[in-house]
From Swiss-Prot:
Belongs to the DnaJ family. Participates actively in the response to hyperosmotic and heat shock by preventing the aggregation of stress-denatured proteins and by disaggregating proteins, also in an autonomous, DnaK-independent fashion. Unfolded proteins bind initially to DnaJ; upon interaction with the DnaJ-bound protein, DnaK hydrolyzes its bound ATP, resulting in the formation of a stable complex. GrpE releases ADP from DnaK; ATP binding to DnaK triggers the release of the substrate protein, thus completing the reaction cycle. It is found in: Cytoplasm. A zinc finger (CR-type) spans 133-211. This is Chaperone protein DnaJ. It comes from Mesorhizobium japonicum (strain LMG 29417 / CECT 9101 / MAFF 303099) (Mesorhizobium loti (strain MAFF 303099)). GO terms for biological process: chaperone cofactor-dependent protein refolding; DNA replication; protein refolding; response to heat.
């Protein structure tokens, strides 16, 4: 027994168009076969969701369903009502709800023209490239307008003809009793025209697939996850329709030395125990390639931060520049020689509370705490 369409979508019987669309969108994204490859249960659920939405979004079909239930669409009822998802099924639903990849509707015109699909290209760049910016050359396989037929899909010297089934409307109406249902024309798939003599090069599609070389400008300061849109560089439209867009999704590779937080950079630099105690300096190479000296005052503690103003990342399309923060990591000596050990032991004997105020004060406070706790 078929499940109730309202229960399938998880909505109340009085749900409005907005609630239906929201419920369908959520469930369709969850159970779409592309997200669940090989899962036949999800594929079956996906078909149920589509059937339910296809019925309830149409006022006439919904009225019939509310009155007669599933019987309205069985043989002898409303012939062909909500059954199947060929013409006017999956494609029409997802064109209505989701549009193409980036949300632009793939629209048909009365002349059979369709907007081309948007394309996605993933690009990985280094932090240095994100810092300086670059112009990248990419090769993208995509459909382009057929030069043989100029995108019409018809054999040169011929023209598309008006569809004999829908007479150019792209829709056909089926009447059963007092019910009337309008569906996408199965002969022209809603285009209103058919091609009697298709172009031999593109097989009537009006476009062919080729690999194109494109130049992509990546501005300085670009961040990980940024999307760049190249208008009209996506798939060519069908039969002379407008092209889709190309979206470049950028990923900035992790750096060996620098971590990024917005426009600021962070770097951890190891220094020796003697440099931390006696003071000194070290040099760091910043992303612009320059050497910058960092002075270490005597008595520098582990984790101390030094700020190099204006040595971070440029802010995208602004004159501002972030800062570079250097954090010291005091390295404890290992594999000591006998003489080194003797010197450190001698240093320990000569040390006072003034040399290590934090550790000395900490242990003194800890001792006092437990002594006072024991007296209670």
């Amino acid at each position: 027994m078929k499940a109730d369409f309202y229960e399938t979508l998880g909505v109340q019987k009085g749900a409005d168009e907005k609630e239906l669309k929201s419920a369908f969108r959520k469930l369709a994204m969850q159970f779409h076969p592309d997200r669940n490859p090989g899962d036949h249960s999800c594929e079956h659920k996906f078909k149920e969701i589509n059937e339910a939405y296809e019925t309830l979004k149409d006022p006439q079909k919904r009225a019939a369903y509310d009155r007669f239930g599933h019987a309205a669409f069985e043989q002898g009822g409303m012939n062909g009502g909500a059954q199947g998802f060929g013409a006017g099924g999956f494609a029409d639903i997802f064109e209505d709800i989701f549009g193409d990849m980036m949300g632009g509707r793939q629209r048909r015109s009365s002349g059979g023209r369709e907007r081309g699909a948007d394309l996605r290209y993933n690009m990985e760049i280094s932090l240095e490239e994100a810092f300086a910016g670059k112009t990248a050359q990419i090769r993208v396989p995509a459909s382009i307008s057929c030069t043989e037929c100029s995108g019409s899909g018809a054999k040169p010297g011929t023209q598309p003809v008006t569809c004999s089934m829908c007479h150019g409307h792209g829709k056909v109406r089926a009447t059963q009793g007092f019910f009337s249902i309008e569906r996408t024309c199965p002969q022209c798939q809603g285009r209103g025209q058919t091609i009697k003599d298709p172009c031999p090069k593109c097989a009537g599609q009006g476009r062919v697939t080729e690999e194109r070389s494109l130049s992509v400008n990546i501005p300085a300061g670009i961040e990980d996850g940024t999307r760049i849109r190249l208008a009209n560089e996506g798939e060519a439209g069908l039969r002379g329709g407008p092209s889709g867009d190309l979206y470049i999704f950028l990923a900035v590779k992790p750096h060996e030395f620098f971590q990024r937080d917005g426009a600021d950079l962070y770097c951890k630099v190891p220094i020796s125990m003697t440099t931390a105690a006696l003071g000194g300096s070290f040099e760091v190479t910043t992303l612009d390639g320059t050497q910058t000296k960092v002075k270490v005052p005597e008595g520098t503690q582990n984790g101390r931060q030094f700020r190099l103003k204006g040595k971070g990342m440029p802010v995208l399309r602004q004159p501002n520049v972030g800062d570079l923060y250097i954090q010291t990591a005091v390295e404890t000596p290992q594999n000591l020689s006998r003489r080194q050990r003797e010197l450190l032991e001698e240093f320990e004997q000569l040390s006072s509370q003034d040399n290590s105020p934090q550790s000395s004060g900490f242990f003194a406070r800890m001792k006092d705490f437990f002594e006072s706790f024991g007296e209670r």
